[in-house]
Amino acid sequence: MRRISLTSSPVRLLLFLLLLLIALEIMVGGHSLCFNFTIKSLSRPGQPWCEAQVFLNKNLFLQYNSDNNMVKPLGLLGKKVYATSTWGELTQTLGEVGRDLRMLLCDIKPQIKTSDPSTLQVEMFCQREAERCTGASWQFATNGEKSLLFDAMNMTWTVINHEASKIKETWKKDRGLEKYFRKLSKGDCDHWLREFLGHWEAMPEPTVSPVNASDIHWSSSSLPDRWIILGAFILLVLMGIVLICVWWQNGEWQAGLWPLRTS
């Protein structure tokens, strides 16, 4: 068998290292925008029936409530967004989405097994990697119970709680509703994410402590930090295996010269 010399294949190793760096960039370079809505079927006077929190890369920077129909900026990022033309559009959209979600809650309330006032928790999520949208989804919980997941990328529903099966069938039949969810998460959310990232990347460092978004998000398009670390570790191990194989075939392992070859 022809021996493969380490010095005769530098291009191969450089290409492998380049692919490794690209893979790591894709894994850790993702950005996300998350809108968390809490909708109440009934609210006391002076208390909002809709509240929303907006997270960029898990950092809370905007808050909204229906009582005054205003968006409150938080931290330096929130103040930067406040000074843009996007602010008015965002305020209007949050109000419209809140009203639409409240109508959905009224529609499904008879299917919720409780006589008490009901709440609907909704998370709209979008993600970008390598300059493109790689994730868009909606997650729903009724009265704190996780119920449904809608993947706007492939227009599919997942039932989390079997009691939400009827709700899922009702919404699935409404093609206009599905298109509405897709437009908001894959269209508007992704557009805002691109806009906000310009301000995020211009900041020297996050000025708002990371706050985890609602734990009702289970989209497979979002990679948890532990999986990013595990993936990077696996890639490094694979690189080590390839290098060992090259040195082994070059006969340096047996000669006791690995990894001290200088020529």
Curated annotation (Swiss-Prot):
InterPro entries the UniProt entry points to: MHC_class-I_related (IPR050208), MHC_I-like_Ag-recog (IPR011161), MHC_I-like_Ag-recog_sf (IPR037055), MHC_I/II-like_Ag-recog (IPR011162)
Disulfide topology: C126-C189
Cytoplasmic compartment residues: 249-263
GO CC terms: external side of plasma membrane; extracellular space; plasma membrane
Subcellular localization(s) per the UniProt record: Membrane
Task of the protein: Binds and activates the KLRK1/NKG2D receptor, mediating natural killer cell cytotoxicity.
Record note on domains: MHC class I alpha-1 like and MHC class I alpha- like regions down-regulate the cell surface expression of KLRK1.
Family indicated by similarity: Belongs to the MHC class I family.
The protein's name: Retinoic acid early transcript 1E
Organism: Homo sapiens (Human)
Gene that this polypeptide is encoded by: RAET1E
